[in-house]
Amino acid sequence: MTRDRSNLLYEDAGRFIPGGVNSPVRSGRAVGTNPIFIREAKGCYLWDEDGNRYVDFVASWGPLIVGHAHPAVVEAVRAAVEKGTSYGIPTEIEVRMARKVVEMVPSIEMVRMVNSGTEATMSAIRLARGYTGRPGIIKFNGCYHGHGDCLLVKAGSGLATFGIPGSPGVPEEVVRHTIPLSYNDLDEVESVMERDGDRIAAIILEPVAANMGLVLPRPGFLEGLRKLCDKHGALLIFDEVITGFRLARGGAQEFFGVTPDLTCLGKIIGGGLPVGAYGGRRDIMMKMAPVGNVYQAGTLSGNPLAMAAGLATLDLLCEDGVYESLEEKTNHLVDGLNEAAGAAGVPVFTSRIASLGCGFFTSEPVFDFASALASNTDAYAVFFREMLNRGVYFAPAQFEAFFLSMAHESKDLDFTIEAAGNAFVRVKELCAF
């Protein structure tokens, strides 16, 4: 499998784009390879500029739960773009999208559209501080909430991949009100809340941490956070940019039965186009301008193309049997990968939930950021390259999840499992455990 065209494009991109990519993890540096450049995608398949085909388990980092270029989504965008690309004036489709989100997500009574998950979390933090009159924010090590300054502390995703604890350019004064704690350690949170609860505006977290690989909440962790927020008058914010509409129609809050005060959304809600949203209780959301005095705005917020793609995607997810089918596919894939790793004698701890999964190259359980970081990233790099050469595209970094879509079929999963069997053999040959 040759990638001459991709390599030439990457070299050319480096002349004009820092690192040759518009988001760091895409570079492939964490797995010792150049990125592939994509020409087109359909269903669960990618084709690169050299004509190589890959079974895709990245799905644009999560948004494409219905698959690439689903006919219903394509037609919705086509119909919208023929009327115009952006107006900067309210449209009916924004109202339809807002109504749909309120119907689907248990905690959301009102919602505001933005253009990215980062905008959603930044806005939710500002709103929480404005509503409570408090400055403090608790976040969790390894949880990634976009690249807003106050949350870029001990974060996951690309910062974990490249070993960056924070970022130059973020002054200490900006993050001094941010308290990073250990995910899944309820006792630590309780201790901080007992000491500083009267200055904590909110606790924000990914209810399932999907930016340090995939780490599930321990039983009682989310429920405990809800109780602590209620006790101390803080808001609970779920960052459901990844889990929203993926774990269930109502996201992780429906899946676990825990209701936050505010919810941040992105990825799936845009159907593959740039979009984000934040919403929650009516009394909190009514603090936003123009009815309240907490300010947030955006030139392209509620963009009609993104609303059209998102609505078409959400309509597809409301069909019968979608989530049951996705979970069945995920179990089939993960069981096959585990069996292949075991046969090759490669230690892998696999985490899965709904249509999300991650294989950590370690024999120890992974339950927080520290245990995730203890996994063998060199082994993952070998696995990634071997799978890529066999026509399967996983995330080019250990600390990212893989995603299944409605477009994956049994033949694609079986193809992937067979490829993994050979890849794990190579991992065993090349890596020390």
UniProtKB/Swiss-Prot annotation:
Its cofactor is pyridoxal 5'-phosphate. Its EC number is 5.4.3.8. One of its GO terms (biological process) is protoporphyrinogen IX biosynthetic process. Its main location: cytoplasm. It comes from the Bacteria. It holds the Pfam family Aminotran_3. InterPro entries: 4pyrrol_synth_GluAld_NH2Trfase (IPR004639), Aminotrans_3 (IPR005814), Aminotrans_3_PPA_site (IPR049704), PyrdxlP-dep_Trfase (IPR015424), PyrdxlP-dep_Trfase_major (IPR015421), PyrdxlP-dep_Trfase_small (IPR015422). Gene3D superfamilies: Aspartate Aminotransferase, domain 1, Type I PLP-dependent aspartate aminotransferase-like (Major domain). It is an enzyme of class 5 (isomerase). Keywords: Cytoplasm, Isomerase, Porphyrin biosynthesis, Pyridoxal phosphate. It catalyses: (S)-4-amino-5-oxopentanoate = 5-aminolevulinate. SUPFAM superfamilies: PLP-dependent transferases (SSF53383). The modification N6-(pyridoxal phosphate)lysine is found at K267. Pathway: Porphyrin-containing compound metabolism; protoporphyrin-IX biosynthesis; 5-aminolevulinate from L-glutamyl-tRNA(Glu): step 2/2. One of its GO terms (cellular component) is cytoplasm. Belongs to the class-III pyridoxal-phosphate-dependent aminotransferase family. HemL subfamily. Homodimer. This is Glutamate-1-semialdehyde 2,1-aminomutase. It comes from Syntrophobacter fumaroxidans (strain DSM 10017 / MPOB). The lineage of its organism: Bacteria, Pseudomonadati, Thermodesulfobacteriota, Syntrophobacteria, Syntrophobacterales.
